[in-house]
A protein has these predicted regions:
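Short, compact, well-ordered microdomains
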Residues: 51-94
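N-terminal domain-onset segments
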Residues: 1-50
């Protein structure tokens, strides 16, 4: 059988190691926002999930799921799977 994903609106922030990105992640509800600097050239974001700690690297999108959970998504997969909702709303109203 084939299945299609239900259309779901999600919230997401692209992780970049800067103050603006960290603030947006906090505003999204990720608490705590834990950036690990063990490798100074490659900081990673550690996200607590039901499956354990997930690691996001710079450029990954952090998605807030429909039940309030958070998980990372690689940029190529994110851009293939999602489109900006505000833009979609504008186009639908034309």
């Amino acid at each position: 059988m084939k299945y299609r994903k239900k259309p779901v609106v999600i919230e997401a922030v692209q992780f970049v190691d800067n103050e603006e990105s960290i603030l947006k992640l906090s505003e999204l509800g990720l608490d705590p926002v834990r950036v690990d600097y063990a490798d100074l050239d490659n900081p990673v974001l550690k996200i607590e999930t039901l499956e354990g700690v997930m690691i996001a690297t710079e450029g990954d999108y952090i998605i807030k799921g429909v039940q309030g959970e958070f998980y990372p998504c690689k940029p190529d997969i994110f851009l293939e799977t999602y489109e900006e909702f505000e833009l979609l709303n504008i186009l639908d109203s034309i």
